[in-house]
Amino acid sequence: MGPLLERWISREGRSDGGDASGPVLFWCVLIIFAVPDAIRSSSLRLGQVAPRLVLFSNFKAFRSPKFAKILPGSDLFSPRVLGFRTRVVLLLDVFEVGFALFCKASSTMGNSLPVESKVTVEEENDRIKYIVSSMQGLGHKMEDAHAAILSLDDTTSTSFFGVYDGHGGAEVASYCAKRFHIELCNHEDYHNDLTNALDNVFFSMDENLQQSDAWRELVIPRDNGWMYFLKAGVCANFWPFPQAYTGPAYEGSTACVVVIRGDQMIVGHAGDSRCVLSRQGGLAIDLSSDHKPRTSESERERVQNAGGISLGVDCEKVMENYVIKEQWILGYFGESVTISRSIGDFAFKQNKDLNREEQMLICDPDIHTHDITGDMEFLVIASQGLWSCMESADVVAYIHVRLLEGVELRVICEELVQSGLASGENTTVILVQFKPGAFQFQYELVDPAAFDTAASNVASTSAGPAGGSDSDTSATSDEGVDDTATAGTTTTGYEAGSSTGPGSGGGSANAAFDSGGDLAANLDIATNFGSDDLAANLDIATDIDTEDVFTFINSDDTFGINSDEVELDPNFRPKPQVRRAHDGPSPTPSEIEADLNASPTRYNMRDIFEAFDKVEAELGGFPLQGHDVSSTSTNPNTATDTGSGSRTGDDDVDGAIARAMAVASSVMTGAGYEVDSTTTNPSAAADTGSYTGDEIKVDDSTSGSARGDSGELVNNDTTVADNNASGVADSTTVGDEVDPTATVAADDSNTGDKVDPPAITKATADSNTSGEVDVDATATATASASAAVADDEGTAPDDSEGSP
């Protein structure tokens, strides 16, 4: 069977489980003489594909003498009727030009409406959880494929995830999804050298496709009715001259796979499918780089050296959005692709003058190994449909924010797949979430007490190596000990388990430990133990419970961080993906400080924590810039420095960090003062900290104001509005509010009437009427019992209840 018909049949087969559309029945009139003679003659000389006439036995086919004039070996056919069936289809495969144009034209039509139905699967174990979702979108057919396997074998803790983005058809991608991980398990280095095994599988997959068409049995099984009948029965028997199998010429697939074993993950990829890691705080890290001539100088150079040229940049409009696509690598018959590495696509790998690694397209993967640490949050493995619409940092930031909002991982994955609709391509996304506590942090925590014990053991005053006793298995001396030292001298590098000391004279500044069992002041070590005398310039990157080191414990100084001992790097600028409660570029620490002074409520709690998480994730902890960690005071201005560093007094602390954390404390406690203040009144606070006058107050504009009994401030005075009878004057509450607009005086029929202000200074209620309100007990005149009686109706505006 000719490769054209095989390609045509394979295009109709659906590897995603959908029904295969039957062969298109059409009348094909191929006007051969319309093709320029120069093209015909050059094509014949190239001889890339032998011309042939394919006939179906259940159709009636004619061939005119005009065709015989241009077809080599035309004497094999006579101009007669070749069949006597009721229907006719004439399919001419002349250098695959005519039919290739037909297939290309039909495929570019795509779908007028997107296929938005999604296929989503999720599974988890005690260490990881994954979600995979895929959608056809606006693609003319689904050419993406994937594989997600939590347990790849029965003997090792190995998980496998792979995304395969097919082009020119779905069959190569489908084959990779079904066979790639099996080839990996069967490789001889699978148990001993997983990295090498993964690298070799990329090449073996390419070789399997090129050797024979047996791989298609996985894609088009025997029970697929008419497809297998056409392929293995009818069509194969109508061309009696067998041809060498060449593999899928213009069909291929990318591959981006991740293998997780123990606390390691190995990422291998070829093409433009991508793997991105999110570290703590939403920091995006690309674990793969796209193999495209447009974005990679080395890839572009290889493609051009092999004869590939750029066809230019095409700006295609998809659903009111413009998507930029650059076509590269001009093939023999106008075929082109946008990537420079893939599995398959053998039309671009057959230059006999070049080595395998010099071809226009190669299958060589990039392989990277990474340790999985506790600060890693999740992986995103996706096809180009997603990355055409969103950058890596945007995808990670989106997932991070949605997780903080409590959205399920399944919903997030489907939202990402939906966003790929704008690219006009198929989209497949795999999210792999690392469960908290399942993996170790990069720096393990050490028990300070245990280390102090070890330190005291080596703080001996005995003689040097010659007189000491060796406590380990070494026959001669401790590892790293200076054998040339003599008794009474200091020696560097003693093993921690040794019972000998640095010399009879005790420790010194150059010894591993001083005589008190503490770390020496100038010792440069890579970890941090529970010592109270760490070196001044030591870069501490973990959260160990020490006295004055950055830690997540309840401190007396700030919420979660000892601000008087830590200085934020003034050059640090958070990444753009850190979400804040306002718009604009990411602020520097000095800008944050100015912001806090101007508007203390601008940053909310989550903004501050996200910014701090970003620093810790990117730098492995807050950058400590030389402050002594041995301070005995929490006040940076009055601290007594007990260390040996040059920055004595601990007096150069960046105020931005203290103020930022004060805001954080305000959100949590409802108070905005410096944490170590002794009062909650901003105007009368006795400040015990170092920022007198700078602490954040509740309301500077109401300093000294008293509060009402319902919590409201009342005009900076000491009176309180009675909230039990709002607006009603009574004699039991001094200073009750009265309505200045009232025109009705008090009377006994309307107890609680608003009182006319002029009346309250010159008359009180008469004493012979019960129930009336005493308006002003200090009035200069008293109502006479017979002079004026309250009007029962209470309507006279001049009724003042008596005359003065």
UniProtKB/Swiss-Prot annotation:
User: What biological process terms from GO does the record include?
Assistant: signal transduction
Q: Which Pfam families does this chain map to? A: PP2C
Q: Which residues cross the membrane?
A: 19-39
UniProt KW keywords? Hydrolase, Magnesium, Manganese, Membrane, Metal-binding, Protein phosphatase, Transmembrane, Transmembrane helix
Write down the EC number: 3.1.3.16
* Protein residues bound to Mn(2+) 2: 165, 384, 425
Q: Name the enzyme group at the top EC level.
A: hydrolase
Q: Which GO terms describe its molecular function?
A: metal ion binding; protein serine/threonine phosphatase activity
Is Cell inner membrane a UniProt keyword of this protein? no
Q: How is the cofactor bound?
A: Binds 2 magnesium or manganese ions per subunit.
Q: Which InterPro entries match?
A: PP2C, PP2C_BS, PPM-type-like_dom_sf, PPM-type_phosphatase-like_dom
Q: Where along the chain is composition biased (Acidic residues)?
A: 790-804
Reactions performed catalytically: O-phospho-L-seryl-[protein] + H2O = L-seryl-[protein] + phosphate; O-phospho-L-threonyl-[protein] + H2O = L-threonyl-[protein] + phosphate
CDD domains in the record, alphabetically?
A: PP2Cc
Low complexity bias locations: 468-499, 638-647, 776-789
Gene Ontology CC entries for this record: membrane
Binding-site list for Mn(2+) 1: 165-166
Family as reported in the entry's similarity comment: Belongs to the PP2C family.
Q: What is this protein called?
A: Probable protein phosphatase 2C 18
